[in-house]
Regions:
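Class I SAM-dependent transferase core
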Residues: 1-58, 62, 91, 98-107
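Residues at secondary-structure transition points
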Residues: 35, 71-73
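Ubiquitous "structural anchor" signal
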Residues: 37, 55, 77-80, 153
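Class I SAM-dependent methyltransferase "Motif I" SAM/SAH-binding loop
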Residues: 65-68
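S-adenosylmethionine
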Residues: 74, 81-84, 88-189
């Protein structure tokens, strides 16, 4: 388990964040996960599964469609990188920002209730890493992420079970957008 390799301070912060999400979830549906045990596996370990790729870049990162703050919050805590988390649902973005403020993480993580297309018009190619977990189809999320990446930036897509056709279409779109797949790995949690 990746979580167990982190230092104690980082583990405590990530667990505290997960506990806040589970509590907030009682009033605002941020996730379908309702227990710490499931959250540790399906949110924390899943979020941290790309930590090696995530730490290969410096500079700010962007989490598209952050929902309850996954994978952005665990990755920021684990890596120490600064980032922006966006979600088009304002209530979710406000809730995640409140939890980040409560844990005194607002110096490293900013949350915005905005769509990626709007953010791209506002800031352009700003982020060294763009990450998306369970957001839209692979071709669509590639088109959303590319305008936000600096040259030689990195896009990380955390996907569930993807059919072969969707992967082929994603590779076709990536090539059109001037992107290159560096690596792919399959995890079974």
């Amino acid at each position: 388990m990746i979580f167990e390799t982190l230092d104690t301070d980082k583990q405590k912060k990530i667990q505290a964040y997960l506990d806040l999400v589970i509590e907030k979830n009682k009033e605002l549906k941020l996730t379908r996960i309702e227990t710490r045990e499931k959250g540790m596996l399906l949110h924390i370990e899943d979020s941290l599964s790309c930590i090696d790729e995530f730490t290969s870049q410096d500079g700010p990162f962007l989490d598209i469609g952050t929902g309850g703050g996954f994978p952005g919050v665990p990755l920021a805590i684990a890596s120490g990188r600064t980032g922006v988390l966006i979600d088009s649902v304002q209530k979710k973005a406000r809730a995640v920002q409140e939890m980040i403020d409560e844990l005194n993480l607002s110096n490293m993580i900013q949350v915005r209730g905005i769509r990626s297309e709007e953010l791209a018009l506002e800031v352009g190619e700003k982020f060294h890493t763009v990450i998306a977990r369970a957001v839209s189809s692979l071709p669509t999320v590639l088109e959303l992420a590319t305008p936000l990446l600096v040259s030689h930036g990195e896009f990380i897509a955390l996907r569930g079970k993807e059919d072969e056709r969707s992967i082929e279409e994603g590779n076709r779109i990536a090539k059109k957008l001037g992107l290159e797949m560096i690596s792919s790995k399959h995890l079974y949690i």
